Amino acid sequence: MKIAVLPGDGIGPEIISQAVKVLEALKSEGAKIEMETAPIGGAGYDAAGDPLPEATLKLAREADAVLLGAVGGPQYDTLDRPLRPERGLLRIRKELNLFANLRPALLYPELASASSLKPEVVSGLDLMIVRELTGDVYFGQPRGIETRNGERVGFNTMLYSESEVRRVAHVAFGIAMKRGKKLCSVEKANVLECSELWKEIMIEVAKDYPEVELSHMYVDNAAMQLIRAPKQFDTIVTGNIFGDILSDAASMLSGSIGMLPSASLDEHNKGMYEPIHGSAPDIAGKNLANPLATILSVAMMYRYTFADLATADRIENAVKQVIAKGYRTGDIWTEGTQKVSCSEMGDAVVVAL
């Protein structure tokens, strides 16, 4: 199993180091793992003048899976748009044809008090958001900023093809089948033709999955319902921009964005795995970051790309044990628990494993 390791920027190298510790522990037991590291984002720009250097893309293409830290930092904000770290991330997703983004939001019982919602609203939360990743307004053409009638105008194009919607629908229905057999499709079909097509195709694909109960919700209502009664959801499927916003909102239900992993898959289940949080430049290099989302991303890698459910469960259970023992990085620390550093948390997971 060949893994391309892309630490990226900010806290990326620190959290990736902890995930690599877990992989090394599995390797010491006999797992056939090969890891190679390459720069991406700001680190890619610093090394090669490109947020996605050719050598990094080649490594990612040849690997079975990609493990990514985080990209971005204020020192890159003045670069031309195509050279900014985030563009490297968008490009690698596009180049590897990673069209389905899976973002779980679950709450560990011990962290119920860390959520910004009342414990009774969120305890037992376990939902999955499936976000389409390569279409929509982020990639639609034409786009740009130009002068019209003497003033500047910014424009983007929201666009989905039937095949793009159909393939992410099949992924979402497949995941719903393995979970609670409930799928909620989120769009804005009352005002957007793009969403109208989305909804039509979801209804068509649903015929292939008679066991799954399909419902539909407008995105504004979905945002409200996620806060009002999040446990009504099991699996959500939505487009790129709506998924970007809703999954970040859902992340705070879990107590910390530092707890949540994600997977981005192609049609053969090759994937890129990363925590959903950003590069947190304010705490970079201070050994304060929470590595659990990155470690849980490794569990997702085993679940979806390597189809090794036993190892995925082992990693997830090791994280549960560490949380149950009261170890906490600063973002999830509460009175009466033990505050640990990023590297100490990584060590604790390896011991539990």
Swiss-Prot record:
Gene3D superfamilies for this protein: Isopropylmalate Dehydrogenase
Sites where the protein binds Mg(2+): 220, 244, 248
Pathway: Amino-acid biosynthesis; L-leucine biosynthesis; L-leucine from 3-methyl-2-oxobutanoate: step 3/4
Domain of life: Bacteria
Keywords, sorted A to Z: Amino-acid biosynthesis, Branched-chain amino acid biosynthesis, Cytoplasm, Leucine biosynthesis, Magnesium, Manganese, Metal-binding, NAD, Oxidoreductase
Binding residues for NAD(+): 73-86, 278-290
Cofactor: Mg(2+); Mn(2+)
Reaction(s) catalysed by this chain's protein: (2R,3S)-3-isopropylmalate + NAD(+) = 4-methyl-2-oxopentanoate + CO2 + NADH
GO function terms (MF aspect): 3-isopropylmalate dehydrogenase activity; magnesium ion binding; NAD binding
Record-level GO BP terms: L-leucine biosynthetic process
UniProt: substrate binding residues: 93, 103, 131, 220
Compartments, as annotated in UniProt: Cytoplasm
Site (described: Important for catalysis): 138, 188
Cofactor note: Binds 1 Mg(2+) or Mn(2+) ion per subunit.
One Pfam family it belongs to: Iso_dh
Gene Ontology CC annotations of this record: cytosol
Annotated SUPFAM superfamilies: Isocitrate/Isopropylmalate dehydrogenase-like
The protein's assembly and partners: Homodimer.
Family membership: Belongs to the isocitrate and isopropylmalate dehydrogenases family. LeuB type 1 subfamily.
Function comment: Catalyzes the oxidation of 3-carboxy-2-hydroxy-4-methylpentanoate (3-isopropylmalate) to 3-carboxy-4-methyl-2-oxopentanoate. The product decarboxylates to 4-methyl-2 oxopentanoate.
Protein name: 3-isopropylmalate dehydrogenase
Originating organism: Thiobacillus denitrificans (strain ATCC 25259 / T1)
Record lineage: Bacteria, Pseudomonadati, Pseudomonadota, Betaproteobacteria, Nitrosomonadales
